[in-house]
Amino acid sequence: MSMSPKHTTPFSVSDILSPLEESYKKVGMEGGGLGAPLAAYRQGQAAPPAAAMQQHAVGHHGAVTAAYHMTAAGVPQLSHSAVGGYCNGNLGNMSELPPYQDTMRNSASGPGWYGANPDPRFPAISRFMGPASGMNMSGMGGLGSLGDVSKNMAPLPSAPRRKRRVLFSQAQVYELERRFKQQKYLSAPEREHLASMIHLTPTQVKIWFQNHRYKMKRQAKDKAAQQQLQQDSGGGGGGGGAGCPQQQQAQQQSPRRVAVPVLVKDGKPCQAGAPAPGAGSLQGHAQQQAQQQAQAAQAAAAAISVGSGGPGLGAHPGHQPGSAGQSPDLAHHAASPAALQGQVSSLSHLNSSGSDYGTMSCSTLLYGRTW
């Protein structure tokens, strides 16, 4: 390690004390008077009071000057007892070390490790904060007695265990339930009397009645909630099934369809006796029946004229083939012209033209008879 001002030593305890230890070793080897302090330092024991007060000046001695130029570097003068106590963990003698700032002030004229001019930004701080920083390690031995104290401490009382649940017999439960049905609340004398009867304590009877009352209330509440739920679900399901009666009632209330005669059609007044537009097919069928009946009436009139005989038989020879080709039904109609006239008149209400045609057939019948 070079001690030139260009290279600086790391600022740590081990880096500062290691060159001091080597320098003191060299001094002890050259000077026989320093054997006792170095032996105390090696063995880790406290130095005697006489050696503790002795100081070795770092002056123009050859061995000390050869060791890192410590005078020029401005390293503080340390006693062997202080260094030995610091390295062995005994901090009681740390107050004997000289202040670091005083040494730096005295050696400000020579070139040192940290420069000639100290930085004015940092305050003047002592090396080890004076004698108040001494630590008394002798009291640490009392920590070993904590184990004995913990052993001597009595264990903490555990929480009281819960009493085991008492199970009632069937006879006791039956008697309690029977009395509960009669009376839900018992007075103190009644409770004591019941407890003596079933061999229980009044407290047990009281607690059983309290629990049973709560149980009954909870069951009643659950039952009411279940019934309400069933009603809600039943009302929702029954709403779809009740649609049929509602539809039937609506149909009953709706007006019936009634056939109304048409008085005006396409801006033209219709006949008073004209049927409704929907009866066109019925009217056509009635007209066909009327035509058939008219033909039958003519044939019947011809048959009557033929059956009556007389001079008309030769005058009308054309009627004989027609009368001979008629069916037996026509002969039946010819035999009973009154029935034929009644049938024709019964269909006269279907159509005015049919009724007029019926009157014409009646006139032809009368005319045929006269003729």
UniProtKB/Swiss-Prot annotation:
The protein's PTM annotation reads: Phosphorylated on serine residues.
Known SUPFAM superfamilies for this protein? Answer: Homeodomain-like
CDD domains named in the record: homeodomain (cd00086)
Q: Which InterPro entries match?
A: HD (IPR001356), HD_metazoa (IPR020479), Homeobox_CS (IPR017970), Homeobox_NK-like (IPR050394), Homeodomain-like_sf (IPR009057)
Task: Please list where the region (Disordered) is annotated.
Answer: 219-294, 308-342
Q: Where the record puts its DNA-binding region(s)?
A: 161-220
Keyword Transcription assigned to the entry: answer is yes
What tissue specificity is annotated for this entry?
A: Thyroid, lung and CNS.
Composition skew (Gly residues), residue ranges: 233-243
Which keywords annotate this record?
Activator, DNA-binding, Homeobox, Nucleus, Phosphoprotein, Transcription, Transcription regulation
Could you tell me which Pfam families the record lists for this protein? Homeodomain
An annotated GO BP: cell differentiation
GO cellular component term of the entry, any: nucleoplasm
Cellular localization per UniProt: Nucleus
The record's similarity note reads: Belongs to the NK-2 homeobox family.
The protein in question is named Thyroid transcription factor 1
Cite the source lineage: Eukaryota, Metazoa, Chordata, Craniata, Vertebrata
